[in-house]
A protein has these predicted regions:
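Conserved ABC ATPase signature
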Residues: 140-144, 148
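Helix-to-loop junction immediately C-terminal to a conserved catalytic motif
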Residues: 54
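Conserved ABC transporter NBD signature motif
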Residues: 62-70, 82, 118-121, 225
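The feature captures the beta-strand-to-loop junction immediately N-terminal to the Walker
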Residues: 39-41
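ABC-type ATPase nucleotide-binding domains, specifically the catalytic core motifs of the NBD
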Residues: 18, 59, 74, 99-121, ...
């Protein structure tokens, strides 16, 4: 019986900015519907890993496969068309545009065939998930609260109907209650079968969401395993404290 290919297969991935190597020999696989939390102190390489997967990091070596197809040589826009969407740190919305206009911009990756119907369906899905955005669809996005802007950034990434969602530090700068709501949304998305790769500093909530987790240190995987095994690990505490 043939073994089903993982949805995402990262093998021996290394990446550099100029002559400075940021990632070294990163390998992991994800099945469809799995969630992976990427942990580590500031500067460990979490954001770079997501940028490498999404095609935004050009100087990279190794293999990145999606459903068996090699995508490591593709441009970022081509990777979006393959079904990988990223929510970058800092939201990066079109702040002078309305909520609806931001969402429509996120739908540009949809195929032209039947695009109007796809956009309509995608809008209905994100407004069902984010009812407050539906109420504010005509509001200028720059006037939203920080939490609403982060929800809009996630909703915009979902407009392309991705199979894999990459999230880079989505809780940064948010109040505790907003972070709780944010992770509630992520758990809902996980329940739909979406595959999630989350780079996050909020370790307890990141582990609660994850099926598996990796901890980066100096660009390498220092720890990996089930969240329950990592949650009380002395090793993870030492990594965060710089030991």
């Amino acid at each position: 019986m043939a073994t089903e290919k993982p949805l995402l297969d990262v093998a021996n991935l290394s990446a550099a900015y100029g002559q400075v190597r940021i990632l070294q020999d990163i390998s992991f696989t994800l099945a469809e519907g799995e969630s992976l939390s990427v942990l580590g102190a500031n500067g460990a390489g979490k954001s770079t890993l997501l940028r490498a997967i999404s095609g935004l990091m050009v100087r990279r070596q190794g293999s990145i496969r999606m459903a068996g197809e090699e995508i490591s040589a593709l441009r970022a826009d081509e990777i979006v068309h393959r079904g990988i969407s990223q929510v970058p740190e800092g939201r990066r919305l079109f702040f002078p545009l309305t909520v609806l206009e931001n969402l429509e911009a996120g739908a540009l990756a949809l195929r032209n065939t039947g695009r109007a119907a796809e956009v309509k369906d995608a809008l209905a899905a994100v407004f069902d998930l984010f009812p407050r955005l539906a109420e504010r669809r005509a509001q200028i996005s720059g006037t939203l609260s920080g939490g609403e802007q982060q929800m809009l950034a996630i909703a915009r990434a979902l407009m392309s109907r991705p199979r894999i969602l990459l999230l880079d530090e989505p809780s940064v700068g948010l109040a505790p209650k907003v972070i709780e709501s944010l992770f509630g949304v992520l758990h809902t998305l996980k329940g739909t079968g979406l595959t999630i790769v989350l780079a996050e500093q909020h370790v307890p909530m990141a582990l609660d969401l994850a099926d598996r987790a990796i901890v980066l240190r100096l660009g390498r995987i220092a720890l990996s395993g089930a969240p329950a095994a990592l949650r009380d690990s002395e090793d993870i505490r030492r990594i965060y404290l710089g030991g």
